[in-house]
Amino acid sequence: MADYNALATQFTQFYYQTFDSDRSQLSSLYREESMLSFEGAQLQGTKAIVEKLVSLPFQRVQHRISTLDAQPTGTTGSVIVMVTGELLLDEEQMAQRYSQVFHLVNNNGNYYVLNDLFRLNYG
């Protein structure tokens, strides 16, 4: 079995660097069966997911990861990843806290996001 913690770290670094620089480039990480739950809105499919991410009402964003936990799922090499962290949006000085969960599915050694759940954490 591959080192799932290293996989989770590499994936999240790539995902957030891409998200922060050009969200439209995230399409290669999703498939038609992929699902995104974003602040209660549920979307399915690459096109719908990327359209949602691109339409978010900010120009600049910076993700700062606070915690990252991963576990293997099943026998196919898939991995579930839970991330908590902070977002800095546009010119805001106060970071917003968030939680995000990814279910990464192994497809012949290449991984894609089957499930993506995102929530801002208030309070």
Swiss-Prot record:
UniProt domain NTF2: residue ranges: 7-120
Keyword Cytoplasm recorded: yes
Subcellular location: Cytoplasm
GO molecular function annotations of the record: nuclear import signal receptor activity; small GTPase binding
Top-level taxon: Eukaryota
Record's keyword terms, sorted: Cytoplasm, Protein transport, Transport
Principal location: cytoplasm
CDD domains, A to Z: NTF2
InterPro entries hit by this protein: NTF2, NTF2-like_dom_sf, NTF2_dom, Nuclear_transport_factor_2_euk
Any one of the GO CC terms: nuclear pore central transport channel
UniProt keyword Protein transport present: yes
Any one of the GO BP annotations: protein import into nucleus
The protein's role, per its UniProt record: Facilitates protein transport into the nucleus. Could be part of a multicomponent system of cytosolic factors that assemble at the pore complex during nuclear import.
Protein name in UniProt: Nuclear transport factor 2
